[in-house]
Amino acid sequence: MALLDFFLSRKKTTANIAKERLQIIVAERRRGDNEPHYLPQLKRDILEVICRYVQIDPEMVTVQLEQKGDDISVLELNVTLPEAEETPK
């Protein structure tokens, strides 16, 4: 039966291929559009406050916003601090 299925199977039309690609693009954009407009400014403000106390590379701070359900958002902040320098006694 596999041989019969091979000859009778229809190839995907270009319309179906285009539809699948469009669905992938739309899904990727939706995932990226969930980020609020204030998040980059919030990251800059947090980095500015941290830099008042510790010399830090801006790449060592990550801010992510996760959507947990319809009405719950979780803001995750990860800061990699440099090694503490020993002070002479």
UniProtKB/Swiss-Prot annotation:
SUPFAM superfamilies recorded: Cell division protein MinE topological specificity domain
Transmembrane portions of the chain: none
**Which Pfam families does its entry note?**
MinE (PF03776)
Q: Which InterPro entries match?
A: MinE, MinE_sf
Q: State the Gene Ontology BP annotations.
A: cell division; regulation of division septum assembly
Superkingdom field:
Bacteria
Q: Any idea what this protein is called?
A: Cell division topological specificity factor
Species annotation = Pectobacterium atrosepticum (strain SCRI 1043 / ATCC BAA-672)
Q: What is the lineage of its organism?
A: Bacteria, Pseudomonadati, Pseudomonadota, Gammaproteobacteria, Enterobacterales
Protein encoded by which gene: minE
